[in-house]
Amino acid sequence: MILKFIIQQCVFKVAKIFSDNLIQIFMDISSVYSSSTLFFSKLSLLMCKVFNSKCAGISVLNKDGLFDTIAFCSSTQELENFSYSLKKISKNITYYDNINEIFNNSEIIKKYNLKSYMEIPLKDSKEFYFGDIVLFGDQTLNPNILDTNILTFITNRTSMEFEKKKVSDQLIIAKNLLDQSPSCSCLVSRNGKIIRKIGAFYERLLGLEIGENISSVEKSSDISTILKQVCFENNNLSTETTITKKNGEKYPAEVFVKEISDIHSNSIGIMIIVRDITDQIRLKEMNIELQKKSELEQKRNQELMEARDLALTATKIKSQFLATISHEIRTPLNGIITMGEMLLSTSPLNTEQHDIAETIFGSSELLLSITSDILDFSKIEASKLELEMIEFDFIGCLEGIGKTIGVSITNKPIEIAFLMDTDIPHRLIGDPNRLIQIMLNMGTNAVKYTDRGHIVFRISVISREQNRCKIKISIDDSGIGIGEDQRAHLFEPFHQIDSSSTRKYGGSGLGLAISSKLAKLMGGEVILERSKPGVGSLFSVTLNFEQIGSNTLKSLLPDKSFSRNKTCIILDNYEYTASIASQRFDQIFEESNIILVKESTVKKFFELVQEYKINGDVNKIDLKNLDPELLPFFDSSLICIIVFHRFMDNLDIFLKYVKDFIEFYKKKIVVALGINHKNFKNLPKRRDFLIFKKPISSTNLIKVSNMARKIIPKSSSSSNLIQTISQIDNQQQQQQQQLQQQEQEQQHQQQQLQQEQQFVTISPHSDSSEKKTTPKKDRGKYDFNISPLRIDRFGTESTSSPKIKLYSDTSSDSGESDEFEFSENLRELKSDGELVVLKNQPYKEQRLSNIQLINDPIVTPPTPKANSEVVSTKAESTFFQSSSITIKETRSDSVNSVNSVNSVNSVNSLNSENSNNSLDVGIRTRPRILLVDDNAVNRKVVKLQLKKLGYDCDTATNGFEGFEMQKKDNYELIFMDLNMPLCDGSMASKLIRSHEELNNYKSRANIVGLSATYLHGSKDYCVSMGMDDFVVKPLKLQPLGELVKKYLEVENNNNNNNNNNNNNNNNNSNNNNSNSNSNPNSNSNSNSNSNSNPNQNPNYCNNLPTDFI
């Protein structure tokens, strides 16, 4: 018993000592490690030693139901924290010998080789379970090693430390929040002394030390007052005051005051929160200002809404006005154009009358074109323009446009070319008229802004979907280019690249705008792909169409297999268009060798041929040692030579090249000449080579192909081309002797036939039903409807004009009649009557060529012999002369006619001077007048008006030219247009006035400004620029006459005085020499002198017609 008691007491003592030591160690840990994190780590190490476990730790339950260890250690070191889950959660002390029964994290079990698990729950002061003290062992753990009270102590101490850590974390967060707040806090006593300062902004906002009074920061007593109120009323109070810091800086502040008590309701102090409200006050002021602005904006928006409604109404009225006025303008224009065309085509006019009528007609067509543009634009703006969807020949339409643009290029060295892909569809459904309008606008724009170089149209299909296709048309030119600053406004209506008063290029500025809008209506667009000033521009037009059938350009062109492995030479001095021509001819020559050569190579070839002709036989040309660039001319596969003549090249030289090629190759290859429309009329009527107008069309390609089929034999036994030519030479030498004999016999007959010349009259207003037409051949499937629209020099569109055909007694061998465009022939018309054409006999050598009208209004046709037939002699003032026929016997008659007409004209002139009812436009002393205007039509009109009034004038095209002419000739009266390129009227006027002052002119020139635009103050502006007057175009005849008389009156009066003195002297001399009227010459001289000065007529210019222009 005693031994048992002793043993129990020993065990108790040992347990007590162990427990005391454990508690002491625990207390030491708590006091040494103030950081909760270190406390939890040391506690985990202690638990490992006490329970002899492998690992121990502190875990916390998170909101997702998982446990996160905040400390985890082995008996020797700290380990990495981890998360785990339990299969079931027990809030009591629990022990498991098999850890897999409760623990889910297999990776931790394997990593540390754990077998047993024990958990001691942790609860806060409110008995809320929040985590565990966990023990892991690699063997069985003894849960009874510690007393329950000790475990309770440990858990409570751990829970307290955890809450301490939680509060500490919250305090850190609160401090951070207070530091980030733009306010500061302090705790003061009831008398206002600072006890504690809080917040990072404290020093900046208050800067007071502990013990100082809070009232020292304000001059007013606002804070003191509310402190007293808080002490007595125990309420939350706030006020706004101005705080002055120690450094004297002031700022508006909001002060919040509240008394703070402990848990026993004992006052700890008064909390004061100070917040800088400078930004708030500023923001408040800004809000007030913004509110005022908002009210103003609302008012403005209301005004803008009203203005928008007015603008929409005005736009609608404007569109309606444009449509109405354009229609009303078109109605009288239709009459002017129609009657002008009738006047040109049916009336016998002399040169001056024809020029006037043609000017009226051309200007009317130009006005019609501008009016149509305005009407189209107004329709597009009003969304009233509708497309006409019809089937049309797309290829023919494009090539017709190309010919039309080619006709409009008259005086510029521009090469125009079309390049179409062979998969371009033949027939489409769309609006051909709008396609033509777009392409003509784009093409004429390119022509207008290109002075030299090229304009190339490329047509390709960019997409196909079922029966729809999108076609791209690119227009590449070498014009002036477009700057970056102009591109944003390029497609705006009425926009000009150069809108200054000195602009060089005219136009309404609607072309691109209308084209862009029409393209959008047709499912496409117009874009500027690239442009560089001084280099050129590239525009592209994409349009959508519906395709009909599967025919393309490739299917329409003839089979080209016959030309396989053949050679074609193209002569073109312009490399850019030469490459385009090469690609086009490649469309009809399959697997052919197309060689591009320049004029220098052709010269070398003919020099070589000429050298061998002089020194020997052409057959002896050594091809082995020949210059490589000349070898293609002797290639046996050569089938075609195409010669392209450029505008600036000498046409005669290129015609000689063509003729020499034909002569050398003996017509065994195709020789063709490509030429522009302007030079086409200068070609000989009788020719044995193929010719086509540029740009190259599909019809041109077909002609070359067909001629190649006819000329080129299917097989040839000759090894080279020289042998073939030699064989032909031998055959021709045998025939030449026979021809010489025949020519001798024909010479005698020819002399007789030349004496039997006849006159035939072809009336320009003859009935169109009597015209003979030559049926066209070989049309078939190649009939492209590509007749060009006639574009006259004013750039307006017109229908094709009738033609005058000259016929000889027998038709030519070619079966074709010579044709002249009626409009072109009419421009050269100089007669008052019908056309008189000299008809020759049917010999080729004597066929009429180069028929021209003699520019002399007083030459009458010769009297025909008895054996000549006169069909009509109505045109008494016109004579046709053939360059191939000389009529020596008619010269005497012509001289007699001249004398007789001169006599008649003299009598008519005297009669007109003595007539009181006619306009006083007799010959007089002509004042020196200069007209400066950049518009050719304006120059022509004013010059004709002055001529009608009896005055002559010189003309200049810009201000610099006018200034130079004035320096040279010192004109008395200058009509100066205000808007001109290079130098406008105002600058030219200042130059003239400066020149007059520097050179001390005794009298200065009278300068009258001209403009088609009248603005208020225009006359004052002209006077300020040194001019004497200003008038608005168009000028009426009578006001113009009065204006000229006004500024030339002083000079004319001086001339009149001189004339009167001369007349008196003549009269006195006549009276002295004769006492009677026996000398009629003296009387006539006297009368002539008295009537020679038109200004003596008091009714001068009073009866001038007011509607001359």
Curated annotation (Swiss-Prot):
Keywords: ATP-binding, Coiled coil, Kinase, Nucleotide-binding, Phosphoprotein, Transducer, Transferase, Two-component regulatory system. GO terms for molecular function: ATP binding; phosphorelay sensor kinase activity. CDD domains: HATPase_EvgS-ArcB-TorS-like, HisKA, REC_hyHK_CKI1_RcsC-like. Residues 324-547 form the Histidine kinase domain. Residues 719-760 form a coiled coil. Residues 1100-1109 have a biased composition (Polar residues). It is an enzyme of class 2 (transferase). Residues 739-819, 1052-1109 are annotated as: Disordered. Its EC number is 2.7.13.3. It catalyses: ATP + protein L-histidine = ADP + protein N-phospho-L-histidine. Residues 739-758, 1052-1099 have a biased composition (Low complexity). The keyword Phosphoprotein applies. The modification 4-aspartylphosphate is found at D977. SMART domains: HATPase_c, HisKA, PAC, REC. Residues 767-782 have a biased composition (Basic and acidic residues). NCBIfam families: sensory_box. This is Hybrid signal transduction histidine kinase F. The gene is dhkF.
